[in-house]
Regions:
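Active-site core of glycosidic bond-cleaving carbohydrate-active enzymes
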Residues: 63, 67-68, 83, 367-403, ...
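Catalytic cores of secreted or luminal carbohydrate-active enzymes
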Residues: 122-152, 521, 659-700
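C-terminal motif of bacterial Sec signal peptides marking the signal peptidase cleavage site
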Residues: 14-15
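Sec-dependent signal peptide recognition
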Residues: 2-8
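Short, glycine/acidic-rich hinge or "gate" loops at secondary-structure transitions
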Residues: 350-357, 477-487, 528-533
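Acidic/histidine-rich catalytic neighborhood
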Residues: 471-522
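Acidic/polar, glycine-enriched structural segments that form the non-catalytic walls/loops
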Residues: 18-365, 384, 394-402, 527
Length: 702
C-alpha cells in the first residue's frame, strides 16, 4: 500500500502544478524560512521529531532550563506510546460517569458527562478525565553549577535547519563558547547531540512524575517517592535505565562516544560527564527493553537528513518569493514552518493532541473533531502516507465507538470526542455532545482517494464510509409535519450553544449533506447499491435557517444570533458550511455572502480560535472574495499570532495550537489549487498582480 501511495503521489506532483517556467528551488524555499533564535525566550523553543516522538529545546539546544520555559512553549519529551494512569483504588468504572438524557430522538441516551453534585459519579468522571495522561519522558539538558542563571547564557545564535532536521545552537557560558547540534532519528524515539566546548558541561537526565494536570508540562518534581529510575545495565559506552511509575514502565538507553562517566546524582536524576572537548551521545526511549543496535550521532544525523530531504522534495510546496504584496513573505514563513511542525507533531500512529508532542493540553488526550484541522492538509500537500498512518487507528477503537452508539440508541458507530490510544471516552460536559467529528473519517478517506484513486484504496476505506454514515442517518430525526430531517440534541462546533435547545446548526447540516453524498458515491465505486433511505435524507435535510436580514443563524433555534454575543463569539461555524465544505442545495449563495460580511465587520474576534481564520478564508475564497481570504489568514489578532518557531499562539494557557497550523496549510492549498468547480490558477488569491504564487504538487478541495 505504501509503495502504491508513493508512486501515485509522484505522478500527482508532476500533474498538479501551477503554470511556471522552471521548477521551484525547494532548498532555497525551506532554508530561507529556517527559524533563528538570539535570546533565551520562553516562546521561542525549537523542536525535532518524527510524528511519533518529539523533543523540544531551549536556546542551549538541550533542555537546560525547563523552569524558564514552563509557562512558555515547554521543553517536552513526548511520544505516542508514553501514557500513565494514577491508581484506581476505588475501582471506578466508565459507566459510572454516564448520565441519561432525552433529546426527543424517541429513546433515552447515555452520555459520558461531568456530574456537578459531589459523589461517586462525579469522582468517576473526574478520574476518567485525568486518566490516562501523556507522559513527559524525561529532561535531557546541560548539568550546570547551581549559581548559573539563564542570563549567563550569552551570544546566542540558534537556528533550526529544516532541510536536514537539525538544530544548531551556539552561545557562550562564563566566557566558554559552546556549539551544540541536536537531531532526532526519523524512525526511532531517539535524539542525538554533539557538544563542542573547551570545558564541556555534563548532561543531565532528570525524570519527573506526572502531574495529571489539564494543561501543563506534565512535570511534578516533588514526588520522587512515587516513581523510580534504576540502572539496568552499563558498559564503557552505554547505559540502560528503567523507569517505573505505578503500573507504567519504560526504558531509556543512553550511548556515547569518547570517555564519559554516568553517575546517579539523586533519585530519578543521572548525570553523564564527558572528558573530551567534543562529545556526542544518543538517548532512546522505548516502552520495552530494546534490542535494537546502538547508533552514533553521525548515523542519526545522516538518517535525519535523508528523511527530511525526502519530505521536502517528495511533497508539495508553495513559493511566495515572486509575490509583491508585503504580506507574502510572512505567509510563506507560516506555511513552511507549519509543514515542518505538523510532520513532527501530528503525523503519528494515533491522532494528535492540540498541542502535539510538546506539552499537555486536556491531559495529553486528543480530540477527534480536530483531526480534520490537523491532518486534512497531508492529503493536499502530497503526504498521503502520513494521513493514512493515523487513520488506521480508527479500526482499533471501532468496537468502543459502536458501544457508544448502541448505548445512545443509534445505529453504526459514534466516534468519541476526547480520548487516548485505547479509545476510552473521556467524560465531558461539552465534548460528549459534539457530532461534527462523525463525518471527518468520510471526508479524510475521500481526500486520500482523490489523490490516489486506486482499487486497493477503495477496498481498504469502504467501511470507513459505511459505518459512520449509518450513525449519521440514525441520528437525524424526520419531522413528518414539515417533511424534513433535522439535527438536534447536540452541541455544534460553535460550542456556545446548548445541546438541549439547539436544532439545525448550519455547519453540521452542511456536513451531513456532504458526507452522506460521499458515502453514497463510495458505495457505487465499490460496486454496491445506493441506500435509498440515505438519498431521502440528503434530499430532505433542512436548509440553513436565516433571519429577515438574510443572514444565516447559528442554529434554527438561535433566533437572537445577531443580538446575543453568545452567538457571535467562539467559532463562526456557519462559515464552515461553505468553505470547509462545498456549496450545496441547503444554502443560498447570496445569504452566505451577507453572513460573511456581517461576521467580518462585527464578530467578537477576541473570542476566537486559531482555525477560525483559515475557516473564514476558505469561505471568502469560495464566495469570490480573495482579498478577504488573504486578510483573514493574516488578520492581526492574538489567536492568529505565529511565533518565531511557527507555532500558533492562542493565550496564556494554549501557547501553541496546531489545528491553526493545519488549517492554514489546508486553506493555502485550496487558494492555490482550487476546489471542484473553481476556475484558473490560484483562485483564492487576488488578481491584482501582487500574488504570483508558484506551487507544485497541491491537490484541490472538493
Amino acid at each position: 500500500m505504501k509503495h502504491t501511495i508513493y508512486a501515485l503521489t509522484m505522478f500527482a506532483l508532476a500533474a498538479c502544478t501551477s503554470p511556471q517556467e522552471e521548477a521551484i528551488d525547494r532548498h532555497a524555499l525551506v532554508t530561507r524560512n529556517n527559524p533563528e533564535v538570539t535570546a533565551m525566550d520562553s516562546l521561542s523553543s525549537l523542536s525535532v521529531g518524527n510524528g511519533e516522538f518529539a523533543y523540544t529545546v531551549d536556546a542551549t539546544g538541550l533542555q537546560t532550563f525547563p523552569e524558564v520555559y514552563k509557562n512558555g512553549v515547554p521543553l517536552g519529551t513526548q511520544s505516542q506510546w508514553g501514557w500513565h494512569s494514577f491508581g484506581n483504588p476505588e475501582n471506578y468504572k466508565p459507566e459510572e460517569a454516564l448520565v441519561e438524557y432525552d433529546f426527543s430522538h424517541g429513546h433515552k441516551e447515555l452520555y459520558a458527562t461531568q456530574p456537578k453534585e459531589p459523589g461517586r459519579a462525579k469522582e468517576a468522571s473526574d478520574w476518567y478525565r485525568v486518566n490516562p495522561h501523556r507522559l513527559h519522558l524525561g529532561i535531557i539538558g546541560l548539568e550546570l553549577e547551581n549559581e548559573v542563571r539563564p542570563s549567563d547564557v550569552q551570544n546566542i545564535q540558534q537556528s533550526l535547519d529544516m532541510w536536514n532536521g537539525i538544530i544548531n545552537s551556539r552561545f557562550t557560558l562564563k566566557e566558554t563558547p559552546y556549539h551544540i547540534q541536536t537531531v532526532c532519528h526519523p524512525e526511532r524515539d531517539m535524539i542525538a547531540a554533539r557538544l563542542s566546548a573547551r570545558q564541556p558541561a555534563g548532561i543531565k537526565f532528570h525524570f519527573p512524575y506526572p502531574t495529571g494536570g489539564h494543561c501543563d508540562d506534565a512535570c511534578n518534581w516533588e514526588a520522587n517517592d512515587k516513581h523510580s529510575t534504576t540502572l539496568v545495565s552499563e558498559d564503557a559506552q552505554s547505559a540502560v535505565l528503567k523507569r517505573t511509575l505505578d503500573a507504567t514502565t519504560y526504558y531509556v538507553t543512553i550511548s556515547w562516544e569518547g570517555a564519559a562517566k554516568l553517575r546517579e546524582k539523586s533519585a530519578n536524576y543521572f548525570v553523564l560527564t564527558p572528558t573530551d572537548s567534543v562529545f556526542t551521545f544518543t538517548c532512546q526511549f522505548t516502552p520495552q527493553a530494546s534490542a535494537a543496535p546502538i547508533l552514533t550521532f553521525a548515523e542519526v544525523q545522516q538518517a535525519s537528513s535523508g528523511h527530511w530531504q525526502n519530505y521536502w522534495t517528495q511533497g508539495a510546496v508553495a513559493d511566495f518569493s515572486q509575490c509583491t504584496d508585503v504580506r507574502a513573505k510572512e505567509l510563506e514563513r507560516r506555511v513552511v514552518l507549519s509543514q515542518y511542525l505538523l510532520a513532527i507533531q501530528c503525523a503519528g500512529s494515533t491522532p494528535p493532541q492540540e498541542t502535539g508532542l510538546t506539552y499537555n493540553s486536556w491531559f495529553g488526550k486528543f480530540h477527534l473533531e480536530m483531526i480534520w484541522w490537523h491532518q486534512a492538509q497531508f492529503a493536499l500537500w502530497g503526504h498521503l502516507e502520513l494521513l493514512d498512518r493515523t487513520l488506521s487507528w480508527y479500526e482499533t477503537v471501532e468496537p468502543i465507538a459502536r458501544q457508544i452508539a448502541e448505548r445512545q440508541g443509534f445505529k453504526g458507530i459514534r466516534w468519541m470526542k476526547m480520548t487516548d490510544p485505547s479509545g476510552t471516552e473521556a467524560p465531558s460536559k461539552v465534548g460528549s455532545f459534539l457530532i461534527w467529528q462523525q463525518p471527518h473519517l468520510i471526508y479524510l478517506a475521500e481526500l486520500l482517494y482523490r489523490a490516489n484513486p486506486s482499487e486497493e484504496l477503495k477496498k481498504k476505506k469502504k467501511n470507513k464510509k459505511k459505518k459512520p454514515a449509518e450513525f449519521m442517518y440514525s441520528f437525524a430525526t424526520y419531522e413528518e409535519e414539515h417533511d424534513r430531517y433535522v439535527l438536534k440534541g447536540a452541541i455544534p462546533a460553535q460550542e456556545t450553544l446548548r445541546a438541549a435547545e439547539t436544532v439545525n446548526p448550519p455547519f453540521e447540516l452542511s456536513y451531513w449533506h456532504f458526507a452522506m453524498q460521499v458515502a453514497q458515491t463510495w458505495r457505487e465505486r465499490t460496486g454496491m447499491e445506493r441506500v435509498p433511505e440515505w438519498d431521502v435524507l440528503i434530499e430532505k435535510l433542512s436548509p440553513l435557517a436565516y433571519n429577515d436580514e438574510q443572514l444565516y443563524l447559528a442554529a434554527e433555534t438561535a433566533v437572537d444570533t445577531y443580538k446575543d454575543i453568545r452567538f457571535t463569539s467562539d467559532h463562526m461555524a456557519v462559515l464552515g458550511a461553505v468553505g470547509i465544505l462545498p456549496m450545496n442545495q441547503l444554502i443560498h449563495a447570496g445569504y452566505m455572502k451577507n453572513t460573511l460580511h456581517w461576521i467580518w465587520d462585527n464578530w467578537n474576534w477576541d473570542k476566537t480560535w486559531g482555525w477560525d481564520y483559515p475557516m473564514t478564508a476558505m469561505n471568502a475564497a469560495r464566495m469570490g472574495e480573495p482579498e478577504k481570504a488573504v486578510s483573514a489568514l493574516l488578520m492581526d489578532k492574538r489567536t492568529n499570532t505565529y511565533l518565531v518557531n511557527g507555532h500558533n499562539y492562542q493565550d496564556g494557557r494554549l501557547r501553541i495550537y496546531l489545528p491553526g497550523n493545519g488549517g492554514l496549510l489546508t486553506t493555502v492549498a485550496m487558494m492555490c489549487a482550487g476546489w471542484d468547480g473553481s476556475e484558473g490558477n490560484n483562485p483564492g488569491f487576488p488578481k491584482d498582480g501582487k500574488w504570483n504564487v508558484r506551487w507544485e504538487g497541491l491537490q484541490p478541495l472538493p
